[in-house]
Regions:
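Catalytic Walker B motif of ABC-type/P-loop ATPase nucleotide-binding domains
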Residues: 57-61, 320
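Hydrophobic anchor residue at the start of the ABC signature
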Residues: 46, 309
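Conserved structural motif at the start of ABC-family nucleotide-binding domains
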Residues: 159, 173-176, 292
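Conserved beta-strand-loop-alpha-helix hinge in the C-terminal portion
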Residues: 111-142
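ABC ATPase NBD Q-loop/coupling interface
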Residues: 215-231
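ABC-family P-loop ATPase nucleotide-binding domains
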Residues: 1-35, 241-298
Length: 320
């Protein structure tokens, strides 16, 4: 970033320290980039961009993946930059609720059509109210009409962790964690960026090699007692920012969704036509009709996330 901006000066070093402190980055500066959580990676990319001291700053959905505190800090920082440094800022936002106070003008893009320029005040006064529900009655009934899989969902203890600790080098990510999920429960896992949420989910999804050294039960079976990773994954539908970053496959969307039936990144077994029908069903549920043959790499990032959501739902998993 310093090379992009020019000379490394004392002033830029002070700016660097200010950004580190503002985003609470000191604790992960020595981590490899590949080990950063989605929120930490977002902070890292924002910091790198800000160190370069650009004249025009274009940010695509900068608040996605940030915890509430960091969202507030980023808004304050951008407000400061726009006023004190005369930085030109263009934000691409999917949600009108994310429009920060310092924005002066808005252009709405809808159905591939670019609207007229409006002041923020005029836009907020005339915008259409947000939909309370985007799932139609017909789609909801179609989901409820799917065949029940109660006989396949017979685990009483879906997840149980007993005094689980995860350590990388000198860094302790989780320590003496106890957590039990019973059949029928629905959990929200909440925490700041870097708190260990992604690491915790990697244990549940059998993606963390340290899980074999931990006391973990998944779907009534203790880890390391003969089950394979695929025996576990067949029960789980999973989507995350980390998965989105790694799933860069130039494949038709319907094959991306179908890979969820095979628990693979990519598709190496030809699905049956009935399985393709399942894929089309979930693409339709998420409003993605007509894109089944389009390349995943040619979709917007938002459309890609919806395709990966359909992939997570397609096998009607015991744990989502």
């Amino acid at each position: 970033a310093f090379l992009m901006a020019g000379e490394d000066t004392a002033g830029r070093r002070e700016w660097q320290k200010h950004i580190y402190k503002l985003f609470h980055m000191e604790h992960f500066l020595d981590k490899y980039v590949i080990l950063l959580s989605s929120g930490e990676l977002r902070k890292f990319k924002l910091a790198t961009m800000l160190f370069a001291e650009p004249r025009v700053l274009i940010m695509d959905n900068p608040f996605i993946g940030l915890d509430d505190e960091t969202r507030h800090q980023l808004t304050e920082l951008l407000t400061e930059l726009s006023h004190e440094r005369a930085l030109q800022i263009i934000l691409v936002l999917s949600k009108s609720d994310d429009i920060p106070p310092f924005i002066t003008h808005i252009v709405e893009v809808k159905d591939m059509i670019v609207g007229e320029k409006m002041t923020k005040e005029d836009y907020l006064a005339t915008r259409e109210p947000l939909q309370t529900s985007v799932l139609s009655k017909e789609k909801a009934e179609a989901i409820l009409a799917l065949p029940h899989k109660d006989n396949d969902y017979n685990a009483n203890v879906v997840v149980k962790m007993d005094k689980v600790s995860i350590v990388y080098g000198e860094r302790t990510i989780l320590k003496d964690l106890d957590w039990t999920i019973h059949n029928g429960e629905r959990w929200a896992l909440s925490g700041q960026n870097g708190a260990g949420k992604s690491t915790l989910l990697s244990l549940v999804c059998a993606d963390n090699p340290q899980s074999y050294a931990c006391n973990i039960i998944l779907f009534d079976h203790e880890r390391g007692t003969g089950e394979s990773i695929w025996d576990i994954k067949k029960h789980i539908g999973y989507v995350s920012p980390e998965m989105h970053r790694s799933y860069q496959r130039d494949m038709p969307c319907i094959r991306i969704v179908a890979s969820g039936l095979k628990d693979s990144i990519g598709l190496y077994v030809r699905p049956e036509e009935s399985e393709y029908e399942q894929c089309r069903f979930w693409l339709n549920i998420f409003g993605l009709e007509g894109i089944e043959d389009r390349s995943f790499m040619k979709l917007s990032s938002g459309e890609q996330r919806l395709v990966l959501l359909a992939r997570a739902f397609v096998k009607d998993p015991e744990l989502l």
